[in-house]
Amino acid sequence: MADIKYKRVILKLSGEALAGDKGFGINPPVLKDVAKELKEVHDLGVQIAIVVGGGNMWRGVTGAELGMERAQADYIGMLATIMNALSLQDALESIGVPTRVQTSIEMRQIAEPYIRRKAIRHLEKDRIVIFAGGTGSPYFSTDTTAALRAAEINADAILMGKNGVDGVYSADPNKVKDATKFDHLTHMDIIEKNLHVMDTTASSLSMDNHIPLVVFNLNTSGNIMKVVTGQEVGTTIEGD
């Protein structure tokens, strides 16, 4: 059995990652692949919590284009994350992985409300927990949600799965050919160099609570397993 570096993790999944090449909505083959990889890691004994974004369904810029109030647009985004969470729950349970969805906005007919102690108990009972609805408040990103929940459940690390990007670069590698990839950074590097890995609130939360962050390409099969077993994948961000 492989050695486990991170026993309890938060996986931050962007909505775009679930859309895959489609760019919008949910791509069923991608969803199935993610679920299969998560099952392999879960079967290893790793406790997994997931924070999902909603960018494949709704973008804040869309609300701005409509002249919508920021708070209203953010609430729509929260609902988008819940749709993604329920889809991922179904994909996981269809392959035998017990999964619970907890939402920061109560909707008891379809999910549990977020309760910290209950979430931890689910993890201890080897259930995957998906946190949906962001923080439940507008003006906070799902990156901030990941950092907040990681601190609350005492996660060993935040795993940030990116769509087609294999780590943190000095510039957008899709636009700048000679962009430099970083293997290791500190949380302060992210803030000072304005590297746009997470927003400043999320980076500060991670730094203050000493939570490592690993940024990696979700589209490469086996990467989640490599990260939790301590193999060199993507970019590791830790320390002040």
UniProtKB/Swiss-Prot annotation:
Q: Identify the GO cellular component terms for this protein.
A: cytoplasm
Database matches in InterPro entries = AceGlu_kinase-like_sf, Asp/Glu/Uridylate_kinase, Uridylate_kinase, Uridylate_kinase_bac
Record-annotated disulphide pairs: none
Primary gene name: pyrH
Which reaction(s) are listed as its catalytic activity? Answer: UMP + ATP = UDP + ADP
Set out the biological process GO terms recorded for this chain's protein.
Answer: 'de novo' CTP biosynthetic process; UDP biosynthetic process
Recorded protein name is Uridylate kinase
UniProt-listed HAMAP family = PyrH_B
